[in-house]
């Protein structure tokens, strides 16, 4: 499987996250109850070693973790997690951008095209899919306004991490075309 070394956009650098690259920001994101609630995840108190083990396990299971870094100062500002299904020619993406540093609407319109083009060219991926829990309003808004097709709503797909209810998930898809 071809590996991503680095993708550069005007303002950002995308690069695979190795265990030694786990940032203080990533640790902070995991501990932020407001950010984690948007993702329907519990805020935890992970150590650097915990996240490093997660990175190793992800790469072993063929899930790519791609960091988003500011080109000006190298700050780690977000993450893409990508699970490639070569048999069906698709990739499932999860995205996180640090709301204290940047907004999704500033970062993803610039980084999405570069990463999606990489998948189309290097992995022959034809379709990207993102399944977003209903509480992540900023990501849903981004996907709706940047050419992703809302394919459906999965009713009561996820148990809420807080409270006693279930949450809907919205599935988005985007067909990719490899430029020659």
What is each residue range found by the language model?
Residues 38-42, 58, 102-103, 126-127:
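Short, contiguous strand/loop micro-motifs
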Residues 34-53:
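Conserved GNAT-fold acetyl-CoA-binding loop/helix
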Residues 1-22, 32, 72-180:
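Acyl-donor (CoA/ACP) binding surface of acyl/acetyltransferases
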Residues 53-57, 118-119:
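A generic secondary-structure signal
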Residues 55-67, 78:
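A short helix-loop-beta-strand connector motif used in the catalytic cores of GNAT acetyltransferases and
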Residues 25-26, 35, 51, 93:
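Hydrophobic pocket/interface hotspot
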Residues 29:
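Structured interaction and signal-relay segments at domain junctions
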Residues 34-35, 63-64, 124:
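Generic structural signal for secondary-structure transition and capping sites
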